[in-house]
């Protein structure tokens, strides 16, 4: 037996809670931006995040409502996606506080920054991965805005690379689940994709 839900009858807020409970786990884009005046560095977690394209390399995140991150990206055309590692759990959550626009999360939460190579917004110094992006385009959908950025530089900390490739067991990325739940890396399984020429498997 299944329980059926009608989005229209349930209402937007209740269906949001349902969607975020079943579309799991969701990787977190910890997005750093600069305000238009260049004086305030903002940092916020966004869990509606994924890769949109690999050639050209495009990542996307969704701003639910018009928040500082979106305004800054629209004004400057640049942002950095920092990987949200498990060891910074409390700080990541704290950067989700609705600070006023003039108060940057780096300073408010006490997060060390480092300069980016290709864009103006800083990177999170303690994050093992930073994807420096320039704005490709935005798409307004209802009250949300989909932000697509072209990755112009990627910086990966050396100690998380195994055999030339970032290793998830060393990256230890956080994810968002339903309600106030967060996920961490548990069991990792390796299973190669089966090419059609080898189907059915013996």
Could you tell me what each predicted segment is?
Residues 1-202:
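Basic, polyanion-binding surface patches
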């Amino acid at each position: 037996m299944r329980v059926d839900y009608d989005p229209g009858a349930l209402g937007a807020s209740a269906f949001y809670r349902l969607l975020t409970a079943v579309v799991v786990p969701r990787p977190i884009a910890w997005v750093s931006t600069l305000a238009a005046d260049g004086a305030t560095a903002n940092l916020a977690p966004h869990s509606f995040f994924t890769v949109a394209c690999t050639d050209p390399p495009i990542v996307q995140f969704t701003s639910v409502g018009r928040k500082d991150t979106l305004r800054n990206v629209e004004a400057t055309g640049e942002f950095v996606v920092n990987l949200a590692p498990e060891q910074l759990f409390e700080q990541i959550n704290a950067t989700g506080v609705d600070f006023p626009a003039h108060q940057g999360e780096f300073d408010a939460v006490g997060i060390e920054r480092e300069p980016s190579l290709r864009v103006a917004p800083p990177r999170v110094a303690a994050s093992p991965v930073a994807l420096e992006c320039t704005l490709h385009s935005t798409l307004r959908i209802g009250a949300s805005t989909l932000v697509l950025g072209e990755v112009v530089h990627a910086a990966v900390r050396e100690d998380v690379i195994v055999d030339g490739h970032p290793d998830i067991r060393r990256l230890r990325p956080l994810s968002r689940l339903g309600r106030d739940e967060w996920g961490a890396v548990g069991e990792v399984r390796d299973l190669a994709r089966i090419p059609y020429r080898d189907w059915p498997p013996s």
